Amino acid sequence: MPIIEQVGAREILDSRGNPTVEVEVALIDGTFARAAVPSGASTGEHEAVELRDGGDRYGGKGVKKAVEAVLDEIGPAVIGLNADDQRLVDQALVDLDGTPDKSRLGGNSILGVSLAVAKAASESAELPLFRYIGGPNAHILPVPMMNILNGGAHADTGVDIQEFMVAPIGAPSFSEALRWGAEVYHALKAVLKKAGLSTGLGDEGGFAPDVASTTAALDLISQAIEAAGFKPGVDVALALDAAANEFHADGSYTFEGTPRTAAQMTEFYAGLLGSYPVVSIEDPLYENDWDGWAALTAEIGDRVQIVGDDVFVTNPERLEEGIDRGVANALLVKVNQIGTLTETLDAVALAHHSGYRTMISHRSGETEDTIIADLAVAVGSGQIKTGAPARSERVAKYNQLLRIEEALGDAARYAGDLAFPRFVADPK
């Protein structure tokens, strides 16, 4: 049996130069694995709480307390447990913390242990991680939702929409989808240069030009798709992460310099659908605006994927409430929002059972850890969001998916346009 023998932890840096937690787990059979925990820039108020040190060190963002929690309390509690019983291990972590938001021991310390245990168990079983988590039928490669133009909290510009993504829905394989996305990314750089706009990069590797409006950004990306030799909406589609929490205050959305209601924002998004091949819109409204979300879903949810991130925070309880209220039709999956692998898998299972799509996601503060690539294939999400095809912490996930596709061989299937059943390309 793969019994947990040792648990270690350390403070490392993420892609934004901020500290994060790395956990190492050793099993009695000699197996060893490590996992690093990501961190977000725009976070939902209902997420699992990160344990940070405060004070002057690292501007208060140190994680020595979280590391100590692993070494002094969490590690001793899981040593002796069977690593291949993930639910048992994760329940022990949740019970040990004893709070609904993991604020006592920290979601970052708990998640690090949860993921490291899963990795160690897969190594002990001599199985690839995607196969260990997903079982013998895991074979779907996700559409890479590439954030090639950054705004909002990911860039120091006046663009309110946080992420403008390209989705290579027409590609025949993941490897070709990655190539298509990379070629559009490089074409966008040339388009921006020609327009006299900045080609500086945001947190997630996308360009961060200070463009005048959402439609101006979409026009630039559409030009880049065509310049790369592809057809917008047929080969490569568009997707948005509005991250509306960032421009909502006091019941109003201040968007592109104008105060707007939820109904007016819905009208704006509906207008985009009539003009651009948008397959997915994430967090179009404020996380606690349940009524606005329900109305928006009823209005445009039959034409586009509406993804709940901050509104659901990968939490099965909030997702269940959203399903009951008719809110969104897809779930964004971030392992550090809920804090354990088991709870993440439970949220995905609930979404799929309820007819919701899922999109596995990175955070803006990432590491070289590639577990979300394996997770996307394991659960058959058909979609992954892990930044631009640039910056090694983003590319690491794409490269892992290339390895998985190669390992699967003829059994590999690329999700492509089947991942977005609500979208119909303009026949023109």
Curated annotation (Swiss-Prot):
The record's subcellular location field reads:
Cytoplasm; Secreted; Cell surface
What's this chain's function? Catalyzes the reversible conversion of 2-phosphoglycerate (2-PG) into phosphoenolpyruvate (PEP). It is essential for the degradation of carbohydrates via glycolysis.
Lineage of the species this protein comes from: Bacteria, Bacillati, Actinomycetota, Actinomycetes, Mycobacteriales
Q: Is the keyword DNA-binding assigned to this protein?
A: no
Q: Which UniProt keywords apply?
A: Cytoplasm, Glycolysis, Lyase, Magnesium, Metal-binding, Secreted
Q: Organism's domain of life?
A: Bacteria
Identify the cofactor(s). Answer: Mg(2+)
Enumerate the active-site residues: 204 (proton donor), 334 (proton acceptor)
Query: Could you tell me which NCBIfam families the record lists for this protein?
Result: eno
What is the protein's given name? Enolase
The entry lists its GO molecular-function terms as: magnesium ion binding; phosphopyruvate hydratase activity
Q: In which pathway does it act?
A: Carbohydrate degradation; glycolysis; pyruvate from D-glyceraldehyde 3-phosphate: step 4/5
The entry's free-text remark on the cofactor is: Binds a second Mg(2+) ion via substrate during catalysis.
One Gene Ontology CC term in the entry: extracellular region
Recorded source organism is Mycobacterium ulcerans (strain Agy99)
* Protein residues bound to (2R)-2-phosphoglycerate: 162, 334, 363-364, 385
GO BP, one annotated term = glycolytic process
Indicate the family of this protein.
Belongs to the enolase family.
Q: Please tell me where Mg(2+) binds in this chain.
A: 241, 282, 309
Which EC number(s) does the record attach to this protein?
4.2.1.11
